[in-house]
């Protein structure tokens, strides 16, 4: 009989899920997208980039050009603000208005996970695992716009 190696990590139970992703606002939406085989990526809109895309996009695919990119295609979360209910959080409205959308998405996903877990009263043993690629947030992009785009 093999000896079970002791782990220094405590066991984890995933008891709730939540997500905000391109094209979906809930885990059920995500499963529907998967079941239908849909792809929810799209081209950037003016609201996504706040800059004339023609200045940045190259029509020479695969050829490196300084300050140019080959695609504006990506996974953009759209319409979230139309459905976000700030009153469900015990935070000051002014603070919520100042937060970058990536933080609001995280708050909403955590709210969904807690609701699904049905253990909202047992928070002392509750943790959150967040995933986010290291792309700039909208707030970071606005900061860059205020400084760099004025120089262009």
Model feature map: region roles:
Residues 2-152:
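Cys-dependent condensing catalytic cores that perform Claisen condensation/acyl-transfer
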